[in-house]
Amino acid sequence: VRNAFPGFVSPITPEDLAGLACEEAALARVVLHDRKRDRWELRNGPFAEESFPKLPKKDWTLLVQDVDKWDADVAALLEHFAFIPSWRIDDVMVSYAERGGTVGAHVDQYDVFLIQGMGRRRWQIDANPRAPKAFRDDVELRLLREFTPSHDWILEPGDMLYLPPGIAHYGVAED
């Protein structure tokens, strides 16, 4: 949905998200991708502040779950989804990615509303319900072995993409 949130400004800065990822109780991870060798690395938090400047200039993503439980402005985003029964809402996960950052092609077993906060991200989905769902066995993440996109969009701040459970998707930070 283009411009689903007109004039959207991310309620949390990358610096604040990184700070949250340093908290002992926060559920945080960094995913790094070596595109040349197609190697993936998963690092779990909590992180030390000095670990962020040591990350590469591109090809990584920071993800923090349950951000709505830490930040009232992030929690306020849930008001836009009051039409969904509360038992179907888990949390607000926030990601920050440098150019080329991705978590790989994967499938979630729950409704996902992707709201683009800062920068632009390319999203591809495979809308075929019979698409292969086998996972790679060479990585710690549950990444799809095969992914053939049927749709492709670049989301900008305020844009939203809805993904029903079981829809394969792949997002890569453009900037």
What do the predicted segments below correspond to?
Residues 1-2:
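Short hydrophobic motif
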Residues 14:
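Short amphipathic alpha-helical segment that frequently serves as the phosphate-/nucleotide-binding helix
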Residues 162:
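Conserved beta-strand-loop-short alpha-helix elements that form
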